């Protein structure tokens, strides 16, 4: 009987010790880099020259295996869906694509094995692959995608943009892209 009491006491004692040593901590995911907050103004900054977002689109792929492409320019294009987005030194463009449909949330840009989320700045001669920054999608509707972006080429403030955007959501219709209606 003494042996049974000894083992019960030992087990209860160990349980109490380990129970009192455990801790419950709230953990949050934070960025390993320190990025500034989003500007509350229209997406703007510099891409070699002063740049302010004016026209943009998010193209829905025509097949389930395609990717969603995002195009932005500081040029006033008459039709965001059917216009050509060609970057020039005076009208640079911003491009990126994702395999998944856009949904609300923030994504940090990165260029690591298994996690490539970049943005490209194109100034008519050079494509700058941007892996420092973040993009937040706020809303996705049938016809539009709204969000915020901060992106910088390393520490080069001559290639840095920050602010809000609204993109037309474009779908293919009779071999041409037009505003989605689905």
Please describe what each predicted stretch is.
Residues 149-182:
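Edge beta-strand at a domain terminus
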Residues 1-20:
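Sec-dependent bacterial lipoprotein signal peptides
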Residues 21, 141-151:
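A short hydrophobic beta-strand element
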Residues 31-54, 60:
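Polar/acidic, low-complexity leader/linker segments enriched in S/T/G and N/D
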Residues 57-139:
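Surface-exposed helix/loop patches within compact recognition domains
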Residues 136-145, 156, 169:
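A short, structured loop/turn motif at beta-sheet edges
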Residues 15-42, 175-182:
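Bacterial Sec-dependent N-terminal signal peptides
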Residues 41, 66-68, 143-145, 159-161:
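Residues at beta-strand starts and edge strands
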């Amino acid at each position: 009987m003494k042996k049974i009491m000894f083992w019960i006491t030992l087990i209860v004692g160990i349980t109490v010790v380990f129970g009192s040593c455990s801790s419950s901590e709230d953990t949050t995911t934070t960025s390993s880099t320190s990025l500034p907050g989003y500007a509350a103004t229209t997406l703007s900054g510099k891409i070699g020259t002063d740049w302010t977002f004016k026209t943009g689109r998010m193209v829905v792929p025509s097949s389930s295996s395609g990717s969603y492409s995002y195009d932005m320019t500081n040029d006033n294009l008459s039709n965001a869906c059917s216009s050509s987005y060609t970057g020039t030194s005076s009208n640079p463009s911003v491009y990126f694509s994702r395999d998944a449909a856009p949904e609300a949330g923030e994504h940090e840009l990165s260029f690591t094995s298994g996690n490539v989320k970049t943005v490209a700045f194109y100034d008519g001669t050079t494509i700058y692959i941007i892996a420092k920054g973040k993009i937040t999608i706020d809303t996705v509707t049938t016809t539009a995608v709204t969000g915020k972006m901060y992106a910088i080429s390393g520490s080069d403030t001559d290639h840095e943009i920050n602010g809000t955007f609204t993109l037309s959501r474009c779908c293919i219709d009779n071999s041409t892209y037009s505003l989605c209606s689905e």
